[in-house]
Amino acid sequence: AIAAVTTFLILFTVFGNALVILAVLTSRSLRAPQNLFLVSLAAADILVATLIXPFSLANELLGYWYFWHTWCEVYLALXVLXCTSSIVHLCAISLDRYWAVSRALEYNSKRTPRRIXGIILTVWLIAAAISLPPLIYKGDQGPQPHGRPQCRLNQEAWYILSSSIGSFFAPCLIMILVYLRIYLIAKRRNRRGPRAQGASKGGASKQPHPLAGGASTKPPTLTSSLAVAGEVNGHSKPTGQEGKTPEDLGVVTLPPNWPALPNSGQGQKEGVCGISPEXAEEEEEGGPEALPASPASXGSPQLQQPQGTRVLVTLRGQVVLSRGLGAASGQWWRRRTQLTREKRFTFVLAVVIGVXVLCWFPFFXSYSLGAICPQHCTVXHGLF
């Protein structure tokens, strides 16, 4: 049963991590620099599944080391290298998440493939520094029961404690502190968010955007071509004005209680919804607010606008409601989408890291106890 379950886990690990590498390398949407961490982590897991797990299974089933003595030393070094690399990769990913959340604008400009590759190289160097000492200094290999060859890790207390701290306990402590900090930042932002939005809306409502005609120094106006409700008044449409409804805008029919606007005779070009692009950008920064009613032009009847909307009277007697017009609104929505994606990705990584810590903790706890109190803190062999 143990052999069947372990074999299934080996195949599942190789197949799943190979799919991760293939997806990141072939999908254009996954070619972000930070996803290189996932590629390197998947490579470390494949290394564990192919070069370590099969020999560990054979050693466990046979009860002794069946293979060459030289391969035992290489096998132990590879086991420490890959396992340490996998754990330190999770630590590096958590730090990347923290920097992306706490210093988003500054860090995103520095998050280049070259920088990420340098961090990955540092991770592998740390893992190599922890795995190389057993190859250089053999140390005490412990007794060989029944004269059969055994393949065990270095039994020196100094190496057990140093490798356990460097491979697991230090990265684990860093990950816990980092994700605690991320949680506090997210909690503070969520608590501050409604107040900040309320303040911006209050400030925006104090700055009316009248729809009045005039020169460029006056409040923006509805254009003459858009102010003529031709079909409502029964007049013919001016030539060349058909089909000029702005794209990407929702269109609703003009209510009957809205009076038609006469031709103002002005041909100046204005922004969509009768306001200039500058005023549109200012309005987007403050959030979508209601525009107070004001005269459309000198001598024209008042144009009452529904609260919470921006309108555009077209030639066909319709009202066009804008959907996030302006560069500021687009940037705001992109930023909000990016933050939502970052939060979701951070939550998924927190779950993955938590599961990995729980899986590794029993081994490193028992391994460290063997060095701290070797005679009174023995762990039963059947535990693993």
Swiss-Prot record:
A Pfam cross-reference name: 7tm_1
Compositional bias segments (type: Low complexity): 288-306
Cellular localisation: Cell membrane
Gene Ontology terms: cellular component: cell surface; plasma membrane
Region (Disordered): 193-306
Transmembrane regions listed in the UniProt entry: 1-25, 37-62, 73-95, 118-140, 157-180, 349-372, 382-384
Disulfides per UniProt: 72-151
Chaperone listed as a keyword: no
Cytoplasmic side: 26-36, 96-117, 181-348
Gene3D superfamilies for the chain: Rhodopsin 7-helix transmembrane proteins
UniProt membrane topology term: Multi-pass membrane protein
The entry's keywords: Cell membrane, Disulfide bond, G-protein coupled receptor, Membrane, Receptor, Transducer, Transmembrane, Transmembrane helix
Any one GO molecular function term: epinephrine binding
GO BP annotations, alphabetical order: platelet activation; regulation of smooth muscle contraction; regulation of vasoconstriction
Subunit structure of this chain's protein: Interacts with RAB26. Interacts with PPP1R9B. Interacts with GGA1, GGA2 and GGA3.
Function text: Alpha-2 adrenergic receptors mediate the catecholamine-induced inhibition of adenylate cyclase through the action of G proteins.
Name assigned to this protein: Alpha-2B adrenergic receptor
Originating species: Echinops telfairi (Lesser hedgehog tenrec)
Gene expressing this chain: ADRA2B
